[in-house]
Amino acid sequence: MLEIKNISVAFDRPILNDISFAAKRGQIIGLVGRSGAGKSTLLNVISGQLGPQHGIVLLDNDILPNPEQLLVPGYDEIKLVSQDYNLDPYHTVEENIREAAMSLPEKSKIRRVEALLKLLKLNDIRDVKANETSGGEQQRLSIARAIALKPKVLLLDEPFSNLDSQLRALLFRYILRLREEEDLTIILVSHEGQDVLGLSDAIYFLNNGKLSARKTPFNAYYQLNHLGNAQLLGIVNQTNHNGEKIRFRPDEYEVKENGMLSLDFDYYVFLGTQYLNYFSGTKNEIIILSSTVPFKTDIQIDINRKRQNRKQTRTTPKKANKR
């Protein structure tokens, strides 16, 4: 288990303030926050690259020492994939991975290097020097180096930023498989809501150097009532006065040229009286009056009006066929 206890860091101003959380073996923890919230600083503390003014980091009940100390046992089992890549620019792609796997027996090292070259689609550039590769290729190479020795804890600081959709999906599957097979603990920092929601077992929100909330992906999607946190995940924030909530992802709505907000569903949902807070630069509160029975909807909401009453078509409570 990875445990973060009462971590505080300050430079010219407080960056992290009394941060505490735990991640069990095999868990993936998502960490989200705005730029400057302290996410990368926290990863640097966990990886041992930065010593906190206060607090400790524990791995399997062993306290990990500050980086100022000469001996740092345990940090070989915590690997950070930063946004700086940390590659040897004058060595080839294959040599960079081989160096990261240096402590493995020779046969195991060869198999591991070949597997990583194939996994992250680096085989075609295996003989190219790192400083001659693209940003996306350097990102993938950095990930390959980090997981070469199969660490207990993997820290990912915006790891998918330079990967195309196919490589993102491939890396998603590999991370999940590695977590299951080796009980790998992963701390994921990302500005992309889909990364956090798609991979995480728990999501922490970092605001002004403090952890403001902890949510499961389900609760973050359906029951998150903090506007700022909802925006970080790319979710339009909505609630109603009865406490019922429903959420629309960005790919489920669009604003028409006539100023109408189109919400398009291919399934049945329950709605009471919903207060929809739609944000497009300004806050527009719209009350939608509807039946409490399920309905299939492709509704048009006039975001230029404060209130719109709409009668919904009643249907039987079953799922609609997906289009």
Label for each model-derived stretch:
Residues 63-79, 103:
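ABC ATPase NBD coupling module
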Residues 129-133, 137:
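Conserved ABC ATPase signature
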Residues 154-158:
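Catalytic Walker B motif of ABC-type/P-loop ATPase nucleotide-binding domains
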Residues 208-209:
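Conserved ABC ATPase "signature" C-loop
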